[in-house]
Amino acid sequence: MEAKISVPKYELRGFSLWGFRDMAQCMDFLFDGGRVKRGTLVAMNAEKILTAEQDTELHALLDEAEYKYADGISMVRSIRRKYPGADVSRVAGADLWEALMQRAGREGTPVFLIGGKPSVLAETEQKLRSQWNVNLVGSQDGYFKPEQREPLFERIRASGAAIVTVAMGSPKQEILMRDCRKVHPQALYMGVGGTYDVFTGHVKRAPKVWQNLGLEWLYRLLSQPSRLGRQLRLLKFVSYYYRGKM
């Protein structure tokens, strides 16, 4: 089936981001043409951009990812400021993963899960099967040795997974996805950080009202004061924003 969905791209600090107007458009785009796309999905936010500017390996990994999207509200506001009239909305990574799993369950798309604690991963699998009848063809928790990487990649290839989601945190998940794609390129890869913990209720996400106001970062800071140092780093991004350096 021929692809029909057209989505604009926007440049921020040297990175090209897809600008989705809402989650529905994002999902239609990823499944456009009758099957899920192949490539790598990466959530972009201010912290990741700042880190990439100091980490050449991460920068290269992000450059290689085909589907970078505006996960943070800072990305959306920066796009709208640089490109007035841009019809773009935030696509939160946790919400995108759930939407992707729901669509995969409906269409029978084979899914492989990587990362998380063994108990959390088991809960995630159980909930995905019971809630959306997701066709899970394999899984691996995040506690494996370097010498187990190649056998894992072969397992993924043999499983025929069309979607592989990796919950290991950045940049570990991006590195693993890059390496796995060399063995099994016929899949959509998505780095999901701590999403399994949120999905299973082990980590509480900000209430919807905070999310809708673009204040999820503040909720996390108030819940975890140890994040203060990380948040202060974002002042550099704020300076980019107000000086028109996006």
UniProtKB/Swiss-Prot annotation:
GO terms for biological process: enterobacterial common antigen biosynthetic process. The keyword Amino-acid biosynthesis does not apply. Coiled coil: none annotated. Its EC number is 2.4.1.180. It catalyses: UDP-N-acetyl-alpha-D-mannosaminouronate + N-acetyl-alpha-D-glucosaminyl-di-trans,octa-cis-undecaprenyl diphosphate = beta-D-ManNAcA-(1->4)-alpha-D-GlcNAc-di-trans,octa-cis-undecaprenyl diphosphate + UDP + H(+). GO terms for molecular function: lipopolysaccharide N-acetylmannosaminouronosyltransferase activity. Keywords: Glycosyltransferase, Transferase. Pathway: Bacterial outer membrane biogenesis; enterobacterial common antigen biosynthesis. It comes from the Bacteria. The keyword Ion transport does not apply. Catalyzes the synthesis of Und-PP-GlcNAc-ManNAcA (Lipid II), the second lipid-linked intermediate involved in enterobacterial common antigen (ECA) synthesis. Belongs to the glycosyltransferase 26 family. This is UDP-N-acetyl-D-mannosaminuronic acid transferase. It comes from Serratia proteamaculans (strain 568). The gene is wecG.
